[in-house]
Amino acid sequence: QVGYSGEKPLYYKIDIKKEIGSTTWRYMQRGYKEAVDHDAQGIILHMNTYGGTAVHADSIRTLILNSAIPVYAFIDNNAASAGALIAIACDSIYMRPGGNIGAATVVNETGAAMPDKYQSYMRATIRSTAEAHGKDTTITLSGDTVIKWLRDPLIAEAMVDTRIVVPGLDDSTKVLTLTAQEALKWGYNEAIVNNVHEIMTERLGVPEYTLQTFKPSVYDDLVGFLLNPALQAILV
């Protein structure tokens, strides 16, 4: 038996379409547990977010990196800041036409950039997240072996720090944000798709499936609100 859907493989969809915070973190915990408990074959994060708190983004990132089942990101327009960190943790990233990913500088509640010690930690966090996906080995027509990162950590760092230069892509004057086409070219997007169904059928090769969307309860929203760190001033 595959999942609780019988013959069709079960996949879960968890929406991240608001500011990353305690409520989003609770959604992710509950949705992930529900997916695993029902033997889901994978999770799709349906993302459209401009960022949020660093602590909750890091918690979601860690959950994804340690996930027992594949987690795929569908960037439905925006994965900015904390959203970029979460997307980079996923096994695969897919983007809608016109989508964007990046701009992960650490800022305070007013939007001002935090001191460099905070940026340094975020650079290391986003770099290690990209590195976690490993390297790919290819053999050229001339017989040479080429080894490269599946997701170049330098590109991830450039999303945080204006001083990072990525030859051929980014100079040292701005924080990096990638369009869907740029992300596809540079290894931060596996395909440009219009919807989740295209991911399932064309990218994952699953023509028939059951897609269960995690539906948070009023209690989930209440708990998330009560756990909201009102004094947590550091955002990403």
Task: Give the label of every model feature segment.
Residues 226-236:
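Core alpha-helical transmembrane segments of integral membrane proteins
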